Amino acid sequence: MGLHTATAGRQVAFVASMGALGNVLALLTVSIPTPISQVAPDLSHVATLIVALYSGPMLGGITGAIVSIVPFYRFGVAGWYGPLVGFLIIPLKSLTGITAGFLGKKLRPGFATLLGYVPECIATYLFFMLVVPFFLPQVAQYVTQGFVLLVLGKAWIELGIIAVIMEAIKRRDIVGHILGKTN
Protein backbone atom coordinates (compact mmCIF):
# COMPACT_ATOMS: atom_id res chain seq x y z
CA MET A 1 0.00 0.00 0.00
CA GLY A 2 2.33 2.77 1.28
CA LEU A 3 3.87 5.40 -0.97
CA HIS A 4 2.42 4.17 -4.28
CA THR A 5 -1.15 4.29 -2.95
CA ALA A 6 -0.60 7.72 -1.41
CA THR A 7 0.84 9.02 -4.67
CA ALA A 8 -2.03 7.55 -6.70
CA GLY A 9 -4.52 9.05 -4.27
CA ARG A 10 -2.94 12.48 -4.62
CA GLN A 11 -2.98 12.19 -8.40
CA VAL A 12 -6.66 11.22 -8.43
CA ALA A 13 -7.48 14.12 -6.09
CA PHE A 14 -5.41 16.54 -8.20
CA VAL A 15 -7.04 15.48 -11.48
CA ALA A 16 -10.53 15.52 -9.94
CA SER A 17 -10.08 18.96 -8.40
CA MET A 18 -8.62 20.39 -11.61
CA GLY A 19 -11.43 18.75 -13.59
CA ALA A 20 -13.91 20.50 -11.32
CA LEU A 21 -12.02 23.80 -11.70
CA GLY A 22 -12.01 23.44 -15.48
CA ASN A 23 -15.75 22.82 -15.60
CA VAL A 24 -16.42 25.79 -13.31
CA LEU A 25 -14.25 27.99 -15.55
CA ALA A 26 -16.12 26.64 -18.57
CA LEU A 27 -19.51 27.35 -16.96
CA LEU A 28 -18.45 30.89 -16.14
CA THR A 29 -17.00 31.65 -19.56
CA VAL A 30 -19.36 29.85 -21.98
CA SER A 31 -22.25 31.66 -20.28
CA ILE A 32 -20.94 35.02 -21.50
CA PRO A 33 -23.31 36.17 -24.26
CA THR A 34 -21.75 36.41 -27.72
CA PRO A 35 -23.17 37.47 -31.10
CA ILE A 36 -22.79 33.89 -32.39
CA SER A 37 -24.05 31.30 -29.92
CA GLN A 38 -21.63 28.58 -31.02
CA VAL A 39 -18.61 30.86 -30.56
CA ALA A 40 -18.26 31.41 -26.83
CA PRO A 41 -15.20 31.85 -24.64
CA ASP A 42 -14.03 28.72 -22.83
CA LEU A 43 -11.17 28.80 -20.35
CA SER A 44 -11.52 25.18 -19.22
CA HIS A 45 -8.06 24.41 -20.59
CA VAL A 46 -6.49 26.31 -17.68
CA ALA A 47 -7.08 23.19 -15.59
CA THR A 48 -6.01 20.83 -18.39
CA LEU A 49 -2.72 22.63 -18.78
CA ILE A 50 -2.00 22.89 -15.06
CA VAL A 51 -2.24 19.11 -14.80
CA ALA A 52 -0.41 18.48 -18.08
CA LEU A 53 2.52 20.71 -17.16
CA TYR A 54 2.79 19.44 -13.59
CA SER A 55 1.88 15.77 -13.98
CA GLY A 56 2.51 14.83 -17.60
CA PRO A 57 0.60 13.67 -20.65
CA MET A 58 -1.49 10.85 -19.21
CA LEU A 59 -3.05 12.88 -16.41
CA GLY A 60 -3.21 15.93 -18.69
CA GLY A 61 -5.23 13.90 -21.19
CA ILE A 62 -7.58 12.60 -18.50
CA THR A 63 -8.10 16.12 -17.19
CA GLY A 64 -8.72 17.37 -20.73
CA ALA A 65 -11.50 14.80 -21.03
CA ILE A 66 -13.00 15.78 -17.67
CA VAL A 67 -12.97 19.54 -18.36
CA SER A 68 -14.78 18.93 -21.64
CA ILE A 69 -18.03 18.00 -19.88
CA VAL A 70 -19.44 21.55 -19.88
CA PRO A 71 -18.26 22.40 -23.43
CA PHE A 72 -19.66 19.05 -24.64
CA TYR A 73 -23.03 19.85 -23.13
CA ARG A 74 -23.03 23.49 -24.31
CA PHE A 75 -21.85 22.95 -27.88
CA GLY A 76 -22.83 19.30 -28.37
CA VAL A 77 -25.94 18.30 -26.46
CA ALA A 78 -27.54 21.77 -26.26
CA GLY A 79 -25.78 23.19 -29.34
CA TRP A 80 -25.68 22.59 -33.07
CA TYR A 81 -23.80 19.32 -33.05
CA GLY A 82 -25.90 17.04 -30.88
CA PRO A 83 -24.52 14.45 -28.48
CA LEU A 84 -23.07 12.03 -31.05
CA VAL A 85 -21.04 14.44 -33.17
CA GLY A 86 -20.48 16.77 -30.21
CA PHE A 87 -18.88 13.88 -28.34
CA LEU A 88 -15.72 14.52 -30.39
CA ILE A 89 -15.13 17.57 -28.17
CA ILE A 90 -13.97 15.19 -25.43
CA PRO A 91 -11.04 13.50 -27.23
CA LEU A 92 -10.05 16.80 -28.85
CA LYS A 93 -9.66 18.54 -25.48
CA SER A 94 -7.89 15.47 -24.17
CA LEU A 95 -5.44 15.72 -27.08
CA THR A 96 -4.29 19.14 -25.88
CA GLY A 97 -3.58 17.77 -22.40
CA ILE A 98 -1.61 14.86 -23.82
CA THR A 99 0.41 17.00 -26.24
CA ALA A 100 1.14 19.76 -23.73
CA GLY A 101 2.12 17.13 -21.17
CA PHE A 102 4.80 15.78 -23.51
CA LEU A 103 5.97 19.23 -24.59
CA GLY A 104 6.01 20.56 -21.03
CA LYS A 105 8.95 18.29 -20.22
CA LYS A 106 11.17 20.06 -22.78
CA LEU A 107 9.71 23.54 -23.37
CA ARG A 108 8.80 26.58 -21.35
CA PRO A 109 5.19 26.46 -20.11
CA GLY A 110 3.96 29.16 -22.49
CA PHE A 111 5.38 27.42 -25.55
CA ALA A 112 4.15 24.02 -24.38
CA THR A 113 0.70 25.54 -23.92
CA LEU A 114 0.59 27.09 -27.38
CA LEU A 115 2.18 24.17 -29.23
CA GLY A 116 0.09 21.73 -27.21
CA TYR A 117 -3.02 23.17 -28.85
CA VAL A 118 -1.79 22.68 -32.44
CA PRO A 119 -3.09 19.07 -32.83
CA GLU A 120 -6.48 20.06 -31.37
CA CYS A 121 -6.57 23.06 -33.72
CA ILE A 122 -5.95 20.88 -36.77
CA ALA A 123 -8.48 18.30 -35.58
CA THR A 124 -11.04 21.05 -34.90
CA TYR A 125 -10.58 22.39 -38.41
CA LEU A 126 -11.07 18.90 -39.85
CA PHE A 127 -14.09 18.37 -37.58
CA PHE A 128 -15.78 21.48 -38.96
CA MET A 129 -14.80 20.94 -42.59
CA LEU A 130 -15.26 17.14 -42.89
CA VAL A 131 -17.28 15.68 -40.02
CA VAL A 132 -19.98 18.34 -39.65
CA PRO A 133 -20.94 18.47 -43.35
CA PHE A 134 -21.02 14.68 -43.58
CA PHE A 135 -22.98 13.93 -40.41
CA LEU A 136 -24.92 17.18 -39.98
CA PRO A 137 -25.80 18.52 -43.45
CA GLN A 138 -28.51 20.76 -41.94
CA VAL A 139 -25.81 22.59 -39.94
CA ALA A 140 -23.18 22.59 -42.70
CA GLN A 141 -24.54 25.74 -44.34
CA TYR A 142 -23.62 27.71 -41.20
CA VAL A 143 -20.14 26.24 -40.87
CA THR A 144 -18.27 28.41 -43.35
CA GLN A 145 -14.54 29.08 -43.56
CA GLY A 146 -15.22 32.40 -41.84
CA PHE A 147 -17.02 30.67 -38.98
CA VAL A 148 -14.20 28.15 -38.57
CA LEU A 149 -11.58 30.92 -38.58
CA LEU A 150 -13.60 32.80 -35.96
CA VAL A 151 -13.77 29.72 -33.72
CA LEU A 152 -10.06 28.96 -34.12
CA GLY A 153 -9.05 32.61 -33.73
CA LYS A 154 -11.02 32.79 -30.49
CA ALA A 155 -9.33 29.60 -29.32
CA TRP A 156 -5.86 30.96 -30.05
CA ILE A 157 -6.64 34.13 -28.09
CA GLU A 158 -7.77 31.95 -25.17
CA LEU A 159 -4.62 29.83 -25.40
CA GLY A 160 -2.49 32.99 -25.51
CA ILE A 161 -4.09 34.13 -22.26
CA ILE A 162 -3.69 30.67 -20.76
CA ALA A 163 -0.02 30.57 -21.85
CA VAL A 164 0.65 33.74 -19.83
CA ILE A 165 -1.17 32.20 -16.85
CA MET A 166 0.86 28.97 -17.16
CA GLU A 167 4.13 30.90 -17.28
CA ALA A 168 3.20 32.70 -14.06
CA ILE A 169 2.01 29.53 -12.32
CA LYS A 170 5.12 27.53 -13.26
CA ARG A 171 7.57 30.37 -12.64
CA ARG A 172 6.26 30.81 -9.10
CA ASP A 173 5.70 27.04 -8.74
CA ILE A 174 2.28 27.80 -7.28
CA VAL A 175 0.87 24.32 -7.83
CA GLY A 176 4.07 22.67 -6.58
CA HIS A 177 3.76 24.57 -3.31
CA ILE A 178 0.09 23.63 -3.00
CA LEU A 179 0.89 19.97 -3.65
CA GLY A 180 3.77 20.07 -1.20
CA LYS A 181 6.51 19.45 -3.73
CA THR A 182 8.94 21.61 -5.67
CA ASN A 183 10.42 20.93 -9.08
State what each model feature region is.
Residues M1-N183:
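Loop-helix junctions at membrane interfaces
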